[in-house]
Amino acid sequence: MEDFVRQCFNPMIVELAEKAMKEYGEDLKIETNKFAAICTHLEVCFMYSDFHFINEQGESIIVEPEDPNALLKHRFEIIEGRDRTMAWTVVNSICNTTGAEKPKFLPDLYDYKENRFIEIGVTRREVHIYYLEKANKIKSEKTHIHIFSFTGEEMATKADYTLDEESRARIKTRLFTIRQEMASRGLWDSFRQSERGEETIEERFEITGTMRRLADQSLPPNFSCLENFRAYVDGFEPNGYIEGKLSQMSKEVNARIEPFLKTTPRPIRLPDGPPCFQRSKFLLMDSLKLSIEDPSHEGEGIPLYDAIKCMRTFFGWKEPSVVKPHGKGINPNYLLSWKQVLAELQDIESEEKIPRTKNMKKTSQLKWALGENMAPEKVDFDDCKDIIDLKQYDSDEPELRSLSSWIQNEFNKACELTDSIWIELDEIGEDVAPIEHIASMRRNYFTAEVSHCRATEYIMKGVYINTALLNASCAAMDDFQLIPMISKCRTKEGRRKTNLYGFIIKGRSHLRNDTDVVNFVSMEFSLTDPRLEPHKWEKYCVLEIGDMLLRSAIGQVSRPMFLYVRTNGTSKIKMKWGMEMRRCLLQSLQQIESMIEAESSVKEKDMTKEFFENRSETWPIGESPKGVEEGSIGKVCRTLLAKSVFNSLYASPQLEGFSAESRKLLLIVQALRDNLEPGTFDLGGLYEAIEECLINDPWVLLNASWFNSFLTHALR
């Protein structure tokens, strides 16, 4: 246990715990569970205080560590962790300056916003019992009590939890992690059973006379004497307590806590129906680039100039024709829209000076494709509230779709390496403070593993498209602006390269609210024949626009070039998140860092170099019907990045719901694997909540399928 504590906790916390045990004459070599408990309590106190400040207006605010906070006052004064003399000096000073009542026992924190001392409790038992013990010991209504447990429960005075939900969730997650780490090392049972209650006067002395009578009178209802109450508390069974409480709430509620065994869970039911379709804002694995190397043309860097230069590299244009019509659209309009783009680009080239931006003529085909004048007129509610049959639009339930193999292929492709470099070394960004050697080393290793990854190309493509579209939406609200879809990269030899994927034409964009929609038509080059997987391209009209000569093992071959055209829409908030897709790099880097930290704590030294350079070692990547898939550390980096990127590309309410609900089932299964004997009630309700998120979204359906593979292998 001592080794675990030294690996698991910050050295400063370990040092403070050692001092505290020395001060109370306890041997940490013998009292190892107490050592762990003190460290945990210290860490919770520090996490409680972290990032919370009071601004100049006296309001409580949360500030992340990288923000400048020189003018801000810390919201909490930390008393726990100081030696007794210093701690009492701090308490006395607070009482003198704020007029707060001096507590009988040393509290853990002082809250300058609520002007109260706080006692933090961390328990391995039931929060209600521990709360009662704390309250009994302190006997002061002025000190606020906040109890956390290792199972994610909490209890606070008058249900006032002081902190925002996210800050408390950080603490609960950390406690859950400590518990899991202990369980995996076989230390949890001993630690859980070693907790002694708060020592109070009542426990040390036999109570007689008047005090005894008062104790008997002040018991909760249904208890005749103190002995009965003590016997009840000693034999308290939390599961039964929850059942009882629920049955009191309503006659309909009958929650029996059922043991969760290996045979309990069933697979998640995936919907039946036609196969799901591609719904990303731009093509992924099927996209085709027209590229120029070492661009040095006039106006290089201006999107329209770059686009025209890229278009000139291709000579195989031909009369376009529809090869896969859109089921519900007016397909000739899509064809005319592409012809209009070609014609207007031709017009630009004949001008003396190419303009920086191009607004398309408002032709009938573009008006149709962009939904111009299609939105129903908005009427003020007061003008029509007297209409008897006033009602909202009838909206059809979305049609259920089944999982299709193309989305797994898309994901596999996103994990692959390309022959281009998509991010520079500093793309993730330097730290403001002098960066530690280990942190920069990790970042450089990680960047090297993902810089060639196709998921990284999707990030840069997404950032560019969303930035360009948001800029155009604000700068040219009434215009049908032509926006080239461009990305920049380097070849393996380090030469710069500019790529054109196609074009977007933006519709009217008077975006007042974050969720107001701007319509756009996307036109993207591809070599994929849509007739191979027509269900994937349900929302597209696909044209054949040229023939491309490709080098192959047998010489040059000619392949038809297609243009995937569709009407789409997005909003300010979606574009804002799209512009920030680089965050995916950071998220996956942090996940890799936590793997390195876990390895380093076991080996008691930094394992960054070995982690990335030991090419013989394989790591678990994910579950498939075959079992646990393993791969190199580079493959792990790229898989984690691809997951993060797909979460961004396919963000939806279905994904939010599925992630939140399936996580609950995941935690229960993890608890079972850790031999924590979990119990559940209304497991059917949890499955219902998970399955109502499985409607038609390809990424959610794929995640559900992966979850089923995990269930199969986790419970063998």
UniProtKB/Swiss-Prot annotation:
For the motif Nuclear localization signal 1 (NLS1), give the residue ranges.
124-139
> Is Nuclease tagged as a keyword?
yes
Modifications the protein undergoes after translation, according to the UniProt entry: Phosphorylated on serines and threonines by host kinases, including human casein kinase II.
The entry's free-text remark on the cofactor is: Binds 2 manganese ions per subunit.
Q: Name one GO biological process term.
A: symbiont-mediated degradation of host mRNA
EC number per UniProt: 3.1.-.-
Give GO terms: molecular function aspect only: endonuclease activity; metal ion binding; RNA binding
Q: Which keywords does UniProt give here? A: Cap snatching, Endonuclease, Eukaryotic host gene expression shutoff by virus, Eukaryotic host transcription shutoff by virus, Host cytoplasm, Host gene expression shutoff by virus, Host nucleus, Host-virus interaction, Hydrolase, Inhibition of host RNA polymerase II by virus, Manganese, Metal-binding, Nuclease, Phosphoprotein
Q: Name one GO cellular component term.
A: host cell nucleus
The organism's place on the tree of life at top rank: Viruses
Q: Which InterPro entries match?
A: INFV_PA (IPR037534), PA/PA-X (IPR001009), PA/PA-X_sf (IPR038372)
The UniProt function text for this chain reads: Plays an essential role in viral RNA transcription and replication by forming the heterotrimeric polymerase complex together with PB1 and PB2 subunits. The complex transcribes viral mRNAs by using a unique mechanism called cap-snatching. It consists in the hijacking and cleavage of host capped pre-mRNAs. These short capped RNAs are then used as primers for viral mRNAs. The PB2 subunit is responsible for the binding of the 5' cap of cellular pre-mRNAs which are subsequently cleaved after 10-13 nucleotides by the PA subunit that carries the endonuclease activity.
Share what the entry says about its subunit structure, partners included. Influenza RNA polymerase is composed of three subunits: PB1, PB2 and PA. Interacts (via C-terminus) with PB1 (via N-terminus).
Q: What is this protein called?
A: Polymerase acidic protein
